[in-house]
Amino acid sequence: FEMGFIDDFTDVMNMETGALKYIMSLLQREYAGELDLLHAQVPEITEIPCIKFMDAKTDVIMKKFKYKPTDMKDFDPQEEEILGKWAKKELNSDFLFVTHYPSKKRPFYTMDDPADPEYTLSFDLLFRGLEITSGGQRIHDYDMQVAKMKEKGLDPAEFETYLMTFKYGAPPHGGLGIGLERLTMHLLGFKNVREAAMFPRDINRVNP
């Protein structure tokens, strides 16, 4: 979803936290029997803790778990698993927000952190060590967006319609994309995301 007139990207994180609280509460209230059949453990959510990307990379993954990353700008699946274990053990949470991802790894529309432009006002949400969401604050200033496109090697002329919005005024806004099938897969303990989709799609299956 996308939402306008935000104060900062934490508004988006708070909205997702509220949505997940509602979803998990509804599942426990309305579908307890079905969840028992599948031996699903529905997490209790009060608040979702968060940690900055570089703190997670250096303090948790490298120092605490002695894991040597191959990429300092992103996480590999094993690093996400490490963070999931750490969040459960140290913070008693199945969920963990990781914020301030490097600008080089985020799309052209992601707002850089004014305090440190090498990083962004963005986040991923991990659920039991699996990324289920990416989101953040979007750029809403025309000149800033054009500059970011050029920095990413894109031609602003090819995005004329997109940029018109910012020319005539756009509010501070943000949004996220959530993998509901990933969430369902991990919640129910499935091994493959196709098991959590009614009509799975891949390069060999496009119909129905």
Language-model-derived ranges and their functions:
Residues 13-20, 142, 181:
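Hydrophobic face of alpha-helices
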Residues 136-208:
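Active-site pocket scaffolds in enzymes
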Residues 13-17, 110-111, 137-138, 197-199:
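Composition- and surface-driven signal marking solvent-exposed, interaction-prone regions
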Residues 3, 100-101, 129, 180:
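Residues immediately flanking
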Residues 2-11, 129-132:
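A generic structural motif
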Residues 1, 56-58, 98, 135, ...:
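A residue-level signal for conserved active-site and pocket-lining positions in enzyme catalytic cores
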